[in-house]
Design a protein with these regions (language model features):
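Phosphate-binding/switch region of NTP-binding enzymes
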Residues: 165-199
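Short, structured coil segments at secondary-structure junctions
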Residues: 37, 64, 181-183
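Structural motif
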Residues: 14, 126-129, 163
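Glycine-rich P-loop/Walker A and Walker A-like loops and their local beta1-loop-alpha1 context
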Residues: 1-58
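Short internal beta-strands
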Residues: 42-47, 70-73, 163-166
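Short acidic, S/G/P-rich loop/turn micro-motifs used as interaction or catalytic elements
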Residues: 19-23, 49-51, 77-78, 133-139, ...
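Phosphate-binding/switch loop-helix module in NTP-utilizing enzymes
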Residues: 77-146, 150
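Substrate-engagement module of ASCE P-loop NTPases
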Residues: 146-170
């Protein structure tokens, strides 16, 4: 495990280019810090299919989490808004879709509903938001900032450990610095290693 994976902060920003094996490993390590069979895993994905996420999980972690929920945003499934299905890859994985990637209100509602469904079980809840770079293609920085301010607060209140992916090469310094201020920890992948800053 990397040092990043040992973070227990409520909200973590991962600054790394896409297609980095170190980023994928750290993402999975953050999602599987404890016994996976006692975890609720929420995966919000704009660009990756739930099946590819499940395959990565099985190859890296092995054991299925107690609850696995995907919110697949945009064209990753090409399904109707709000559809919930169970994937054949993992019997306990539920996939919900949101067809409009710019619908932050709808996304916030779906995330809140998942957290509410899990609030009474004793499992640890972890989340991955993949990625803010994709979200910023559909909404401006200030709108995303407001959305994340509410979302990170909601995660903190619910005791969720969440990490958010952002490609630093796709955004200017002002955008990155604006978003950094929302997170308890920022991990940046540079020269083959993670540099971590916490507040």
């Amino acid at each position: 495990m990397t040092d990043v994976a040992d973070l227990d902060e409520s909200s973590i920003l991962l600054l790394s280019p896409p297609m980095q094996s170190a980023t994928d490993e750290t993402c999975l390590d953050l999602l599987a810090q404890d016994d996976p069979e006692r975890e609720n895993v929420l995966w919000v994905t704009f660009t990756r299919s739930p099946d590819s996420c499940i395959q990565d999980w099985q190859g890296h972690v092995g054991d299925h989490p107690a609850n696995l929920r995907f919110i697949s945003v945009g064209d990753t499934l090409r399904s109707a808004t709000g559809t919930a299905t169970t994937t054949g890859t993992s019997a306990n994985a539920v996939i919900e879709t949101l067809s409009n990637p710019g619908d932050l209100t709808g996304l916030g509602i779906q995330i809140s509903e998942v957290l509410q469904q899990w609030q009474d079980n004793d499992n640890r809840t972890v989340a991955c938001f993949h990625s803010l770079t994709s979200l910023l293609q559909y909404a401006d920085v200030q709108t995303v900032y407001k959305f994340l301010h509410v979302l990170t607060g909601r995660f903190n209140t619910a005791g969720v450990t969440a990490h958010f992916h952002l490609d630093p090469g796709a955004h200017d310094d002002q955008t990155i610095n604006t978003l950094k201020s929302l997170f308890d920890a920022v991990a940046e992948f540079d020269d083959g290693e993670w540099n971590v800053r916490t507040r």
